[in-house]
Amino acid sequence: MPITPIWPAGSAVNDNGEITFHGRTAESLLDEFGSPLYVIDTDEVRARASKFVTSASNAFNNTVTHVSFAGKALLSKEICRIVTEAGMLIDTCTMGEMRIALAAGVPGRRLVLHGNNKSDEEIALSIEQGFAKIVVDEPNEPARIADIAKRLGKRARVMLRVTSGIHAGGHEFVSTAHEDQKFGVALLPVDADASKLSVLDDLTDVTPAGSNARLGEQSGEAGSDRALRYDIKYPYDMSHEKVSEGDRKLAEAMTMVADGPALAVLKDIQRHQDVLELVGVHSHIGSNIHDADAFIQAAKRMMLLRKTFYATDAYTLPEVDLGGGYSVAYTDGEDSMDIDVELGRLADAVTTVNRALGMPAPVISFEPGRWAVAPTGVTLYRVGTVKPVRLNGDATDKAGNPVHERVYVSVDGGMSDNIRPALYGSDYTARLANRKGSDDTKLCRVVGMHCESGDIVVNEVRLPADITRGDILAVPVTGAYGRTMASNYNQALIPAVVGIGETDAHVMIRRQSIDDLLSWDVSR
């Protein structure tokens, strides 16, 4: 059993109060691999990747599901092999990510290329390697991809990223489906009345899905009748006396989508169909989202786009990718997404709206990153300066209680190995890892070694009152966006990543050295 639910499954506390990972103490790991140190429980990476693949398949048990691992969360050759063996594809968005995945032996057909500013070289490599999908992110990109594909004498598989207008995510920087940001092509015209899309909620209410309903299957007279009426050719003749008010509202919504930028780009892709194969549409609404509500709203809009494109162009988009953003808990008691429950809710909603629209089942795809790897990682630090600071009467803790003293515990890492607290205000916790410690505790703030007052590792945590220089602190849930967002700020060296399982502990990504820093500086 892990220490608490937020710690890796292979972690424990021994009789001496030491944190262990598959039997190895934190002290022994730092002695062998150095400090700071990223520790990744590779057995749990495998288990969580398999779990998501299985949960998606079980939830959408009447259609095909694809799951891609978002490589931006944590990428190495070993991680690539683990997640692909678990049944995942891999999302990449730079030449570096592409090359690491290919070097790991991942075939192109298991890779996806994202990015809002892809280079010609990245596009060419993805086409040459036969990537499963290139995700188009802006209106001029289809022509660029088509030109490169034509030059290479190949046909590229492409998907359009659509900004649905659904806002989700815990921070503005990770909310990615509103219109005023850099990703994707808008679903609706800029002056459109998005409230007209509320008709999609009425559709769900009209034909509720049973737990065993098939995507695209009509259920009863209401579903069949609606599906038949909406096979009228665009731009819909709504003059028929049997057309209901609900039908008129749906026609208005479809007309609005038909006039939108996303559908225009889909049409443009089809104009290049000799070298571009249009495989679907993509939606990513944000990050660290706790339930399926926003995913359901975005999915409904993607299904409406799919129906509208069928009506205008007689083309059924084969796949709808609903992106990533599935949350994990970073501190004990924090909310996290129950994948089985929330994917089940999402499946029911997608089933229902497709039945109401009379559309066949698309392939449903997902892109988890954080969910698969964040809880598998722990960062180990050596404690340096321990500084009690007296505070005035206005200071409070996060619960609002008065605080008269805070202990600043400095460690040998910081924002160079985990930028998330500084960038997003992300909350973490920490635990003394090398001994039991005193029963008395003090209110502490764990801070890094960098020349920034915002260099905070853990904003608030109670640690043993006898914490001292040389102790080891362990910070859990650092498996995602720690190493991949690390920097050399203050010329700090990026720590090693060590993979650990039941059988061994080994270096996955080596620690940087001073020789590395000096070798990169080629000036005279």
Name each model feature, range by range.
Residues 45, 72, 94, 126, ...:
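Conserved, mostly hydrophobic/aromatic
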Residues 73-75, 96, 117-119, 138-140, ...:
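Active-site-proximal loop/turn and secondary-structure-junction residues that shape catalytic pockets
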